[in-house]
Amino acid sequence: KLAGMTGTAKTEEEEFRNIYGMDVMVIPTNKPIARIDKPDLIYKTMEAKFRAVVNEIEEIHKKGQPVLVGTVSVETSELVSKLLNKRRVPHHVLNAKNHEREAEIIEGAGQQGAVTIATNMAGRGTDIKLGEGVRELGGLHVLGTERHESRRIDNQLRGRAGRQGDPGSSQFYLSMEDELMRRFGSDNMRSMMERLGMEEDQPIESRLVSRAVETAQKRVEGNNFDARKQILQYDDVMREQREIIYKQRMEVLESDNLRKIVETMIKDVIDRTVRLHTPENEVPEDWDLMAIVNYMNANLLQEGELEEKDIKGLDPEEMVEAITEKVIARYNEKEEQFTPEHMREFEKVIMLRTVDRKWMNHIDQMDQLRQGIHLRAYGQNDPLREYRFEGFEMFEAMIASIEEEVSMYIMKAQVQQNLERQKVAEGKAVHQDTSKQEPKKKQPIRKGETIGRNDACICGSGKKYKNCCGAGK
């Protein structure tokens, strides 16, 4: 049974239910929430927004109330830090560049007058403890410089303030140039700001604005959910195939006798080969019996062991039966030569190696298919349906390939006796003791008689050596 606990699951309720079949239950807080969540402030430009953010931080800092500034990226956190340095407001920056000081910075973030700039990942899972006199000032104030694509992350940022019944407040500062607003913001909101002729530094503060932003976030979440759901549907195809292969592999590992499995594989290979060359829509005279004979002799039997006359005049079922009988007889002979114990071990090794290699190749092929399958949509075909169909065909082909390779290796394996290994195993020396052998005497190097080029040739022709046998030397 799957279960989990988190403070921000409610916004993802639909995904938990549809994909994992899990319901989301909201448990009441331990103590009543005293945090005040102020409506969003939306500005016309990003420049105006950051001016307002810095002004707000400076005001709150003067009161002594601690501020936690949440940013979407490291770049934004450094920009806010730069602006605060110009105003000479002391602060700490908590991002990926100085994560080693994370514990120290978080510990002081709730102290009076503290200003902390943090990305959404920094300092998560840590309660910011309020210092002396901070509760009277209103607790920790969380200031968001931008809305995230997911409401869940915004809720995590808000939740840094007002923990365990402590006082606190939160507010987000937005601009029409923010990534979220540019991609998913309402055109009505833009035209409304233009019609009102609002100044750059004049914000809109309205629950309607906050709701419009939440609607934009829901659209993003919906798009992301659809993308994850589609990925899961594609992954389900591989998951089903993986379960089948792993189940069969486990059976091989746990089994002490694979003979029945091997015999089934051999019969399947014979049946497939016979069916391939004896189609039902052809008359027996047109069947390619020689192709069956050549395949069987090359992969399952010895050369010449099966002849065309052995299967001529038989229907496909009788052919399969006749060939299977020959192959199983050959299998029994091989087992006698190899001994049953060694045969079982050999079968297991061959089967595991073949399955592992073929499965790895199949994963690569499925990955290649997945990368280009979306192009089928241009042909008015459903890419997911095409992926399932072709993936199943490829899986069937892989299973057939495993059966053929295992059958061939087992039936074509040669039993070789390694005499030297046997002697070593018995403790006998492979070579005689060289200490008792007499050292070989070095033979003198004999040089033949050299003949000058102008001397008489040794063949007795009377010619000079250079003009006879020595010509060209």
From Swiss-Prot:
May bind 1 zinc ion per subunit. CDD domains: SF2_C_secA. This is Protein translocase subunit SecA. PANTHER family: CHLOROPLAST PROTEIN-TRANSPORTING ATPASE (PTHR30612:SF0), SECA INNER MEMBRANE COMPONENT OF SEC PROTEIN SECRETION SYSTEM (PTHR30612). InterPro entries: Helicase_C-like, P-loop_NTPase, SEC_C_motif, SecA, SecA_CS, SecA_motor_DEAD, SecA_SF2_C, SecA_Wing/Scaffold. The keyword Cell membrane applies. It is a peripheral membrane protein. Monomer and homodimer. Part of the essential Sec protein translocation apparatus which comprises SecA, SecYEG and auxiliary proteins SecDF. Other proteins may also be involved. Part of the Sec protein translocase complex. Interacts with the SecYEG preprotein conducting channel. Has a central role in coupling the hydrolysis of ATP to the transfer of proteins into and across the cell membrane, serving as an ATP-driven molecular motor driving the stepwise translocation of polypeptide chains across the membrane. It holds the Pfam family SecA_SW. Keywords: ATP-binding, Cell membrane, Cytoplasm, Membrane, Metal-binding, Nucleotide-binding, Protein transport, Translocase, Translocation, Transport, Zinc. Zn(2+) binds at residues 457, 459, 468-469. GO terms for biological process: intracellular protein transport; protein import; protein targeting; protein transport by the Sec complex. One of its GO terms (molecular function) is ATP binding. One of its GO terms (cellular component) is cell envelope Sec protein transport complex. It is an enzyme of class 7 (translocase). ATP binds at residue 127. It is found in: Cell membrane; Cytoplasm. Its cofactor is Zn(2+). It comes from Cytobacillus firmus. Residues 424-447 are annotated as: Disordered.
